[in-house]
Amino acid sequence: MKTLTGLLLVGLLALWIGLPSTSSKILFGCGISPGNPFPCSLPGLTGNRCRRDYDCPQTLRCCNFRCSRSCRIPPVLPWSCPRNPFKCTIPGIDRCRYDYDCPGRQRCCYYSCSRICK
């Protein structure tokens, strides 16, 4: 049993050593967008205002910016979701959660009180 535990710990250590460090990277997690002009050496130090896009209102996205995550306006690209003209008080039924839930090159967009593939 001790041998198995030791091998498991050595294996995990080997995987951890092989992973790239995120502290030296410039973080900006809003899909394809310009890089974060503020490199962060201590990610998450200032506290996150969101964890995922669902935590943000309307069409804002949860992005890495400076040293924390916050709701930000995503860049408008030709294949981006259109702005949602509706202000919803009661959420609808989502038909997707992420872009990979949609067929082909469609995106999972928040539109008319729910998320749909467009």
From Swiss-Prot:
Tissue-by-tissue expression: Expressed by the venom gland.
Compartment(s) where it occurs, according to its Swiss-Prot or TrEMBL record: Secreted
Gene Ontology CC, one term: extracellular region
UniProtKB keywords: Antibiotic, Antimicrobial, Disulfide bond, Repeat, Secreted, Signal
Major subcellular site: secreted
Molecular function GO labels: peptidase inhibitor activity
Gene Ontology terms: biological process: defense response to bacterium; venom-mediated disruption of cell wall in another organism
S-S pairs: C30-C63, C40-C67, C50-C62, C56-C71, C81-C109, C88-C113, C96-C108, C102-C117
Residues spanning the signal sequence: 1-24
Taxonomic superkingdom: Eukaryota
WAP domain: residues covered: 25-72, 74-118
Free-text function comment from the UniProt entry: Damages membranes of susceptible bacteria. Has no hemolytic activity. Not toxic to mice. Does not inhibit the proteinases elastase and cathepsin G.
Membership in a protein family: Belongs to the venom waprin family.
Protein name per the record: Waprin-Enh1
Organism taxonomic ancestry: Eukaryota, Metazoa, Chordata, Craniata, Vertebrata
